[in-house]
């Protein structure tokens, strides 16, 4: 049992608006007319496409393979035919399109052959690879690959935390999932504990979800495993932030640049645990998720939706009211505006929120900062947002980093309380984007400079090698010339030596003459003309031999 709960700094308590969508059970959304499946479903990398236009696929068939350690596979959410592979709008603040597979369902929803995965009989690394190939990522919004988070870390995992806080207003998909599928969530947690080697499991749920807490505690009793505890945590936004929930449950503060694994703690969304259970126990890759449709809706609720479903085809399920003028993907605190209703549902989509001038009135004009310090009081990362605002606005990014810009979790608490209605988080996102872009440019410039320096070094080395070869050749010529001069400088031979040399030369000449002696040709059978021709040839040979004889120097 946990002896006590801890508090995190800051935070706010906005109106929750949970009851609007939490009352009804999860409903299954019908098959859409088409699916748009972005090839980048994890937060870090894009998968490699495996299909071609015109190809038929089954539900759960891999259509894009993971490449790199931070990538996960992508699968067909239903059976059908690949229409095209083309850039399509995706839920991102930039609004830029991304490569996607467009799939036309055949209406049969035929699965691939599914087999349970025996995770207990294989090494943990093999199970992590299996989860990567099943496309399992964090379903709380960040989309970080689950197989990476299940790694052993530097010190091993002591405590596994399931995040069921769901602290942002309006969103209730995790609440309904815990009420209806608690057994699957805890079965997934048990699988994760086996993979990571964790000793205990803590399930953190905000105390404004009593039915979810009761359902999860009953599931713990049915599972019958030791060291699993469901903990009700105080309702305060952003208690569902990973570092904040770790702080509340364990008292551990995770500094910037460090992960929970550095302290023996790892945190997973309850939806991720359920996805791992479906992948391992049923052989089902992640092709659907539960999301909330709420806000300015006539029939808000939670729906199980295929990944890739266009938002436009989901909205009739909840019947937006006539005065709806905009939509958010995510909650009102951290969500991003949808620039197109053709944007598809991705694995990290937890809510579609409809807005209206009455429900979400447009913000008043931005006023100058009065340095009241309210933003610093509510910042859960204990930053000074007003200072970060000045540096970000003035593009003094170095100072912004000195003031721990990247510790900001973009929860929106500072913007929520700002009396000047300054969109502080927008400034911080802008500054982070500029810094990342500059670092990327600097990295590219460093690579180019390194290549240039290597080329200069290679050219200098080749130049030195050529100079060394030329010097060696010059030295060899000099030595040869010196040897010739030394030979020419030797004194003349004596008469006795000359006579001896003459005798040797004469002996050599006799030996050569004997060797070259040509035996008379057999000319008895030749005609007189032929014999005369042979004789002429022999005469010429004799003349040549006589001319080739060396002239011996005679002594005086």
Which role does the model predict for each range below?
Residues 1-50, 102:
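N-terminal, Lys/Arg-enriched amphipathic/low-complexity engagement segments
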Residues 52-65, 84:
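Short, well-structured beta-strand-loop connectors
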Residues 84, 89-139, 144, 210:
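Acidic low-complexity segments
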Residues 109-111, 138, 160-174, 297:
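Gly-rich Lys/Arg/Thr-decorated short loops/hinges at beta-loop-alpha junctions or inter-strand turns
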Residues 349-366, 376, 380-490:
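Ferredoxin-type iron-sulfur electron-transfer modules in oxidoreductases and energy-metabolism complexes
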Residues 489-556:
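Charge-dense, low-complexity intrinsically disordered regions
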């Amino acid at each position: 049992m946990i002896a006590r709960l801890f508090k995190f700094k800051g935070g706010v308590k906005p109106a929750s608006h949970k009851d609007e969508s939490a009352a009804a059970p999860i409903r299954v959304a019908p098959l859409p007319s088409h699916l748009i499946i972005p090839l980048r479903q994890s937060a870090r990398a894009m998968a490699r496409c495996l299909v071609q236009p015109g190809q038929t696929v089954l539900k759960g068939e891999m259509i894009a393979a993971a490449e790199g350690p931070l990538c996960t596979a992508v699968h067909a959410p239903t059976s059908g035919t690949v229409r095209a592979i083309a850039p399509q709008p995706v839920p991102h603040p930039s609004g830029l399109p991304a490569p996607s597979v467009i799939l036309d369902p055949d209406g049969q929803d035929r699965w691939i052959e599914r087999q349970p995965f025996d995770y207990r009989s294989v090494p943990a690394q093999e199970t992590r690879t299996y989860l990567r190939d099943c496309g399992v990522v964090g379903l709380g919004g960040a989309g970080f690959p689950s197989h990476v988070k299940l790694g052993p870390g530097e010190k091993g995992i002591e405590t596994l935390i399931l995040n069921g806080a769901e602290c942002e207003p309006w969103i209730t998909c995790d609440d309904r999932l815990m009420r209806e599928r608690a057994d699957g969530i805890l079965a997934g947690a048990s699988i994760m504990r086996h993979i990571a080697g964790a000793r205990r499991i803590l399930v953190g749920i905000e105390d404004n979800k009593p039915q979810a807490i009761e359902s999860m505690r009953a599931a713990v009793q049915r599972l019958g495993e030791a060291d699993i505890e469901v903990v009700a945590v105080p309702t305060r936004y952003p208690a569902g932030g990973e570092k904040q929930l770790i702080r509340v449950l364990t008292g551990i503060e995770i500094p910037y640049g460090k992960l929970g694994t550095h302290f023996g703690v790892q945190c997973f969304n309850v939806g991720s645990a359920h996805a791992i259970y479906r992948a391992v126990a049923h052989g089902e890759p992640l092709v659907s998720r539960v999301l909330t449709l709420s806000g300015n809706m006539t029939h808000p609720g939670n729906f199980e939706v295929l990944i890739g479903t266009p938002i436009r085809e989901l909205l009739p399920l909840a019947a937006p009211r006539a005065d709806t003028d905009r939509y958010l993907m995510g909650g009102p605190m951290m969500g991003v505006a949808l620039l197109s209703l053709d944007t598809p549902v991705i694995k990290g989509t937890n809510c579609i929120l409809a807005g209206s001038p009455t429900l979400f009135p447009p913000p008043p004009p931005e006023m100058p900062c009065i340095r009241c310090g309210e933003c610093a009081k509510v910042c859960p990362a204990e930053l000074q947002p007003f200072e970060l605002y000045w540096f970000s606005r003035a593009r003094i990014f170095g100072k912004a980093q000195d003031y721990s810009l990247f510790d900001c979790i973009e929860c929106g608490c500072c913007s929520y309380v700002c009396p000047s209605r300054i969109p502080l988080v927008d400034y911080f996102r802008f500054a982070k984007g500029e810094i990342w872009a500059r670092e990327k440019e600097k990295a590219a410039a460093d690579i180019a400079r390194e290549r240039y320096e290597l080329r200069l070094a290679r050219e200098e080395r080749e130049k030195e090698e050529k100079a060394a070869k030329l010097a060696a050749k010059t030295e060899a010529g000099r030595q040869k010339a010196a040897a010739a001069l030394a030979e020419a400088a030797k004194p003349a031979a004596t008469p006795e030596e000359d006579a001896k040399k003459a005798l040797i030369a004469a002996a050599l000449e006799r030996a050569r003459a004997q060797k070259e002696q040509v035996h008379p040709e057999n000319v008895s059978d030749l005609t007189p003309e032929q014999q005369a021709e042979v004789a002429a040839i022999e005469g010429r040979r004799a003349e040549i031999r006589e001319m080739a004889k060396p002239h011996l120097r005679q002594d005086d």
